[in-house]
């Protein structure tokens, strides 16, 4: 969510100046379903044990288990949780900005220079990467052609919860909630007269493709879309696959640097020359 907020700030829909950001090395979060069923409490001992050992936390969001970017990039203060075996007694705070340093002035504690990006963090990242490959195979999303997309989204009931909870969604008014997206009989009649046919994707497929296109550069694969999907569509895996492809092509990691321009607003000479 912090990375997604940075993406919104780049679109002037937020500001980092008036907020102190405290984040942690993240072990993941439990899905909304567990909160509704009120059984998270019984999972917490296992959660903190896995966190302290730097292991994957069972029963967390699948997106969290597959997440390689669990270290905050833009936090003023980072709380070290992962692989902290003494987590119940003490932890380490990394002060990343002057704002973060000013907050702890006068607070007792041991201060020293240190780097959070340690070998241990790389080992955790390797575990997450391997889990991502495994979960992607289980989701059967290696090759997303139109047939696979149509089959995958055939369960969609059109609730559009995914766009409503998406922290990277930046539209003030969703296109699909406006009259512009609704074509009347005259539109189809005109198209038939001009071309002799009307070829189009179903509204459901069109909606999901447009949503993926809009947020692909800024998607942080948080998994909230899958969390609220009543049809249990693996939206987290689809968004991750789409986002990684676009971000790799654009050499861009969303939420890492507030000063880095969005790919869609950055001109690069001879960009994508191999496919143009």
For the regions a language model picked out, list residue spans one by one.
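Helix N-cap / loop-to-helix initiation motif
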Residues: 1, 162, 234-235
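Iron-sulfur-associated redox domains of electron-transfer enzymes in respiratory
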Residues: 1-149, 153
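Generic hydrophobic/packing signal
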Residues: 21-26, 161, 165, 242
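Ferredoxin-type iron-sulfur electron-transfer modules in oxidoreductases and energy-metabolism complexes
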Residues: 128-154, 171-276
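Cys/His/Pro-rich metal-binding microdomains
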Residues: 65-68, 94, 157-163, 167, ...
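Histidine- and/or cysteine-centered catalytic micro-motif in compact active-site loops
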Residues: 98, 161, 167-172, 179
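Sequence-level detector for tyrosine residue identity
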Residues: 30, 47-48, 69, 73, ...
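Short secondary-structure junctions and interdomain/linker hinges
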Residues: 12, 71-74, 159-163, 249, ...
